[in-house]
Swiss-Prot record:
Task of the protein: This reaction introduces a second double bond into the aromatic ring system.
Annotated NADP(+) binding sites: 48
Pathway linked to the protein: Metabolic intermediate biosynthesis; chorismate biosynthesis; chorismate from D-erythrose 4-phosphate and phosphoenolpyruvate: step 7/7
Keyword set, alphabetical order: Amino-acid biosynthesis, Aromatic amino acid biosynthesis, FAD, Flavoprotein, FMN, Lyase, NADP
Transmembrane segments: none
Source taxonomy: Bacteria, Pseudomonadati, Pseudomonadota, Gammaproteobacteria, Enterobacterales
UniProt cross-references to Pfam families, sorted A to Z: Chorismate_synt
Cofactor(s) needed for function: FMNH2
Cofactor note: Reduced FMN (FMNH(2)).
Annotated protein name in UniProt: Chorismate synthase
Positions that bind FMN: 125-127, 238-239, 278, 293-297, 319
Catalyzed reactions: 5-O-(1-carboxyvinyl)-3-phosphoshikimate = chorismate + phosphate
Keyword NAD: no
Length: 354
């Protein structure tokens, strides 16, 4: 399995499985001299971790991060930073009864066909549990981007099912378990999630991530355009099935005369392109929307096949999120931060300035 790393200069390599001993990652390319402690990473990990509310997975993981290397006297040294999280609430026995079945909508079938072997315990490497290490690495990038360039990254739930959440109050995002920016929609979302849990079903979602105060110049045309690398990184998040930058698919219904982000001496008049032009950051706020499919592991029986190719009916037990889009918010923020950090260092290496 060769696809465990992302980035060229700021490079993140993760390892570990959902119900294995631990999760870990190596972060290369962190500039020396950055004040960094475990709590800097723990804040975002707590936003992602399961068991934090009755609306997400009941798996109770503390996700306590350990920094194993790359820090001396509280500062980064420029060497590889090793990070580790032990799995404390793994329950592989939950999957014993379905180990010979391919859960519909999961990676079980494709992993088995590709590798001839798979870790059936919660999907193993294919589980979203792996993303804990992306969040830890992303927290390092976020800290550097903010402290050195005042770049702010914010994500939020913009739609769940038919409930649309407008960006009304930034403070509201962290004040509810759904990362919802509209205080008037929180109760409605809670009722939806409770109804889904009662029925044993799940729902899809759309999340939005933003970056403010970006300099002009991030992105390496033609194949490493900023939006191309963002698509690569964000589409690697479990359950993400769609992505749009700025107006995205809405451009289909627009005229060129009304959507070209005209400029004046005062700056851009609009930001339909979401802060990226020609694959390079324009200095405007970067705006990306992600669509996530509903959780496939639900209590409603479904048809599938076993390893012998026979049609069977199965019900998935275990501890699963009724909407994976909720906990995907800090994951998407982290992947955005990782890509921006890598492109910032690449730009500085080639051009030497902003």
């Amino acid at each position: 399995m060769a696809g465990n790393s992302i980035g060229q200069i700021f490079r993140v390599t993760t390892f570990g499985e959902s119900h294995g001993v631990a999760l870990g990652c190596i972060v290369d390319g962190v500039p020396p001299g950055l004040w960094l402690c475990e709590n800097d990473l723990q804040i975002d990990l707590n936003r992602r971790r399961p068991g934090m509310s009755p609306y997400t997975s009941s798996r109770r993981e503390s996700d306590q991060i350990r920094i194993l290397s790359g820090i001396f006297e509280g500062k980064t040294t420029g060497s590889s930073i090793g990070l580790l999280i032990e799995n404390k609430d793994a329950r592989p026995q939950d999957y014993q009864s379905i180990k010979d079945l391919f859960r519909p909508g999961h990676a079980d079938y494709t992993y088995q066909k590709k590798y001839g072997i798979r870790d059936y315990r919660g999907g193993g490497r294919a589980s979203a549990r792996e993303t804990a290490m992306r969040v830890a690495a992303g927290a390092i990038a976020k800290k550097y981007l903010f402290e050195h360039f005042s770049i702010e990254i914010q994500g939020y739930l913009s739609q769940i099912g038919t409930i649309c959440c407008e960006f009304k109050e930034k403070e509201c995002i962290e004040a509810n378990p759904f990362f919802c920016p509209d205080p008037h929609k929180v109760e409605e979302i809670a009722e939806l999630i409770c109804a889904l849990k009662e029925r044993g079903d799940s729902i899809g979602a759309k999340i939005t991530i933003m970056a403010k105060n970006l300099p002009v110049g991030l992105g390496e045309p033609v194949f490493d355009r900023l939006d191309a690398d963002l698509a690569h990184a964000l589409m690697s998040i479990n359950a993400v099935k769609g992505l749009e930058v700025g107006e995205g698919f809405s451009f289909v219904n627009k005229l060129g005369s009304e959507s070209r982000d005209e400029m004046t001496s005062s700056g851009f008049s609009t930001n339909y392109s979401g802060g990226i032009l020609g694959g390079i950051s324009s200095g405007q706020p970067l705006l990306v929307h992600l669509a996530l499919k509903p959780t496939s592991s639900i209590a409603i029986p479904a048809k599938t096949i076993n390893q012998q190719g026979e049609t069977v009916e199965m019900t998935t037990s275990g501890r699963h999120d009724p909407c994976v889009g909720i906990r995907a918010v800090p994951i998407a923020e982290s992947m955005l931060a990782i890509v921006l950090m890598d492109h910032l260092l690449r730009h500085r290496a080639q051009c030497g300035h902003f």
